[in-house]
Amino acid sequence: MVRNIMAKEFSRTRRIAQQLQQELAQVLQRDMKDPRIGFVTVNDVDVSRDLSYAKVFVTFFEEDKAVVQEKLNALISAAPYIRTLVAGRMKLRVMPELRFIYDSSLVEGMRMSNLVSQVINQDKAKQQQFGSEEASVEDEVLGDDVADDADETEGKD
């Protein structure tokens, strides 16, 4: 019995977190006119069990850490206003207090993907450069093996 109540509670917080993520994304794209924030992506929302706090994980497509910190500070200062806008769109008795946290995982993932792509391209270039030399060496070695095989079959007849 207790387990079912806890499972329902967690699924409710998960549903609220998903809806909060969608509403925050819309509010930040359409309703926020602060030029300091710019383009922001809401990656995830983690709501506390009692629904009093929500950690909002965001990403900015900026490499400069100072610019990222400025944008994050602008979001943090606008959090009460954003909370009011989102509260008008959601039917909750208590709207969680928003805590914005910069999530570098997306930027880090893109950086890692670019590094992997660079290594793959370098390997392809090396294969093309050395591939023709290796192919001619393999032909010479295989040619000798074929000649040896021919000599062996002639001796058996």
Curated annotation (Swiss-Prot):
GO BP term, pick one: maturation of SSU-rRNA
Entry superkingdom: Bacteria
Gene Ontology MF terms: ribosomal small subunit binding
Keywords: Cytoplasm, Ribosome biogenesis
Compositionally skewed regions (Acidic residues) per UniProt: 135-157
Matches recorded under Pfam families: RBFA
Alphabetized InterPro entries for the sequence: KH_dom-like_a/b, RbfA, RbfA_dom_sf, Ribosome-bd_factorA_CS
Region (Disordered): 127-157
GO cellular component, one term: cytosol
Cell location: Cytoplasm
Role, per record: One of several proteins that assist in the late maturation steps of the functional core of the 30S ribosomal subunit. Associates with free 30S ribosomal subunits (but not with 30S subunits that are part of 70S ribosomes or polysomes). Required for efficient processing of 16S rRNA. May interact with the 5'-terminal helix region of 16S rRNA.
Assembly description: Monomer. Binds 30S ribosomal subunits, but not 50S ribosomal subunits or 70S ribosomes.
Family membership noted in the UniProt record: Belongs to the RbfA family.
HAMAP family tied to this protein: RbfA
Protein known as: Ribosome-binding factor A
Organism this protein belongs to: Shewanella baltica (strain OS195)
